[in-house]
Structure formats: structure tokens, C-alpha cells
Regions:
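Charged interaction scaffolds used for protein-protein
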Residues: 1-310
Length: 310
């Protein structure tokens, strides 16, 4: 029976994907196998959309493979890290899910394998530690079994927090046209034109590597907490913003596409700084990119917090 919202053809594709999942090594298999199948099938469209969103940071438009950096973004944005189960442990699950293939990227079935594994070990962080030498104390720990831990992680963390592949389109339709965003960009058009000329080195298009180098030279790839607010920009986010803003990403950005790319990047970088409205996020990022302000200057101007600078 095809899951809700899935056509018979898509259902055939899903069954092919499901058969490729490597779950036999996870505790309790195969007792929960049908239940895990049903949980994944019920959320299939959302999980496909999330996978495409994080796998979108490559020029070939290859939203079919997720690399480790893209996976890191997913883990952080979906709030999967806990005190007892950090990113290093999760990246071990990335490697296990990818076992047997000769690449360092995850395809969709490997991504699903990894979600199931992470949900179990995240809910049972003691499990791996007590295996073997500590087996006699096993009963002291309460197992949180599958499929419950998977359902809970999806409904509480992954589905509400992770980006989907409509993210770029929603930005174009709802955030970009806001008067405050247009005013923030409009106030710096001349400086942006100069920036474009310099960074593109006079070419007809601004290339991805030129854009990444410009961000890197201003130290804008960072993960900071300032006055209690997370302020973060990663290379996959910057690439995704570039590709979403360019009509022909392989050629690069045209002059009128640069402001759009900057607005996207600004709203990603300052996404969690709630005292900044969208216009202020763009203004702040422009002052990072074109001026002398760093992230702390931008955030503290909004929060009124005390600077840590000498």
C-alpha cells in the first residue's frame, strides 16, 4: 500500500530505497523493522525535501549526495546534538551508513540509515559504552527502543527545525520583497557595484570561488555565540545561497543577482539573532562584508550588550 501522498511509481522507488537501508546491525532488529518502515514512509516527502535542501550546495545541482560539511549543517540546524551525544559520535554514524561505498558522501538511502542509527544512539548514549565489558550492568539502563526514538527525533527535532528544498523559493517570495530588506540593499547599491567589480576582477559574472574567497577574507565563516545569540555561517550555506541566487550558477552571479545572494547569506548568518529584523540582518551583514564591523559589533548594537573587546 503506497504511503499517504505517494504515487504508485514513487512508491516503487521508495521500496527500492527501503531495501537498500542497512539496519540489521542496530539493536533490536528485526523486531521494529516494519514500524521503522512505516515511520519513514509516513514522512517520506518531508525527508526527501530536507535531504535535497542540504545536498544542494554543489554546482552540478547534485541534490542527490550529502557530504560531511552539509551533514554537519543538518545536525546543527535540526538541533540533534545532546550533552551525551555530540557531533563526533554522529559523524561516526555518517561513516557507518556510508560503509561499503567507495565515496565520502551519503545518498538518500544512506541518509535514512544514518537517521535511524542516530535516533537510537542519541536516545541510548550509554548503549555503545556498555556493550561487551559492561553487559552484565545492561539492565541498569532503560533502553529507549525503536521506532519510538525515531518518531520522537523526527517530530521534535528534524521536521520542525531542518531546512527543506522550498527554503530558497520561500525566501524569494516572502523575505526578499520586504521593504526593510529592499531598503537595506538599496542604501548600498553603489558600494555593492564597486564590490562586484573588484571581486569579479572585471569579468561578466562573479564566480563561486571569488564569492567564497571574499567571505573567507573577511572571516565571515564562523560559529559564534554573542550575548546569548548564535551567529553562524558555513561554506555549504554560502554555496547554497549563491546557487539559489544565480540564474545560471555555472556561469556565476550577474551584478543584479549579487544583492539577492547577499540578502540570503545575511539572513542565514543572523538567523538566530532575533533582535535583528530582516532588514537589520542585511544591514549588519553588509557592514561585515563592506565595512569594518565584525559580528560582535552587529549583534551588540541590537542587544545593547557589553563588548568583550579590550
Amino acid at each position: 500500500q503506497p504511503p499517504k501522498g505517494i504515487s504508485p511509481d514513487a512508491h516503487k522507488d521508495w521500496l527500492r530505497v527501503w531495501e537498500m537501508l542497512q539496519l540489521h546491525a542496530v539493536h533490536g532488529f528485526p523486531l521494529w523493522e516494519k514500524d521503522v518502515h512505516d515511520v519513514l514512509a509516513a514522512n517520506l516527502e518531508s525527508l526527501q525535501s530536507i535531504f535535497r535542501a542540504y545536498a544542494a550546495a554543489s554546482l552540478e545541482g547534485s541534490a542527490t549526495e550529502m557530504d560531511m560539511e552539509e551533514f554537519h549543517d543538518f545536525v546543527i540546524e535540526a538541533s540533534l546534538i545532546t550533552d551525551q551525544y555530540g557531533f563526533d559520535s554522529m559523524s561516526g554514524q555518517f561513516t557507518k551508513a556510508n560503509a561499503g561505498s567507495n565515496d565520502t558522501v551519503l545518498e538518500f538511502h544512506e541518509f535514512l540509515t544514518m537517521l535511524v542509527r542516530i535516533s537510537f544512539f542519541r536516545a541510548n548514549p550509554q548503549y555503545g559504552m556498555r556493550k561487551g565489558k559492561d553487559q552484565k550492568n545492561a539492565e541498569k539502563f532503560d533502553d529507549v527502543p525503536l521506532p519510538g526514538c525515531l518518531s520522537e527525533m523526527l517530530t521534535e527535532k528534524v521536521l520542525p527545525n531542518a531546512r527543506t528544498d522550498t527554503y530558497a523559493q520561500e525566501f524569494t517570495e516572502t523575505t526578499l520583497p520586504l521593504p526593510e530588506v529592499q531598503a537595506a540593499l538599496g542604501g548600498q547599491l553603489e558600494q555593492l557595484s564597486t564590490f562586484y567589480e573588484m571581486v569579479s576582477a572585471g569579468r561578466s559574472h562573479l564566480q563561486l570561488d571569488q564569492w567564497m574567497e571574499a567571505l573567507s577574507s573577511k572571516l565571515l565563516f564562523s560559529d559564534l555565540t554573542i550575548d546569548g545569540y548564535v551567529c553562524r555561517l558555513t561554506e555549504p550555506q554560502a554555496k547554497a545561497a549563491f546557487y539559489a541566487s544565480a540564474a545560471t550558477p555555472a556561469s556565476g552571479l550577474l551584478p543584479d543577482e549579487l544583492p539577492v545572494c547577499i540578502a540570503r547569506t545575511a539572513c542565514d548568518k543572523y538567523k538566530h539573532v532575533s533582535p535583528l529584523n530582516y532588514g537589520a540582518k542585511v544591514t549588519g551583514f553588509l557592514s561585515n562584508l563592506l565595512g569594518e564591523d565584525d559580528e560582535e559589533d552587529v549583534v551588540l548594537a541590537a542587544t545593547g550588550g557589553a563588548s568583550s573587546k579590550p
